[in-house]
C-alpha cells in the first residue's frame, strides 16, 4: 500500500500515491495499486513518478518524505488532452511537478519509445524546454536523455 516501506542494506523504498488507474486485463480495472516511488539511501533521494496525471499527490509526497535530489517525471503520452489529462502529465505540468517536488534535478521520462498517443514522438522534450524557459528554470537541471545516455553530473553534485 502507499506509504508502506521496505528497508534493505540502508535503502528505503516506499510507494507513493499518484493520480492514475490500473488494468492488466478486461476484468481487473483498479484491482491493483498504482504508485510513484521514493527511494532513499544515505544522503540521496530519488523519486520515480511513474504513470501519473497532475495532482496534489506530489506535494503530499514532499510533506511526508521530503524533497528528492533527483526525480523521474513523465512528459509524454498526453494528447488528446481532454482524454489523457487525468492519467498523463504534459511537459508544462511536468514543470509544475518539478516545482512541487522541490527536486534538485529531474529527468523527463515516458516519451519517445512507443507511439502511445497523438502528439509527435519528438514533441515532449521540445515542449519541456519551452516550458522550463517560461518558468525561468535552467534546462540543465531538468532534461531528457537519449536512449542509453547517462547523466553522471547529477550524482557528482
What spans do the regions from the language model cover?
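Core dinuclear metal-dependent hydrolase active-site scaffold
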Residues: 1-66, 130, 147-157
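Cap/insert and terminal regions of metallo-dependent hydrolase folds
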Residues: 45, 52-146
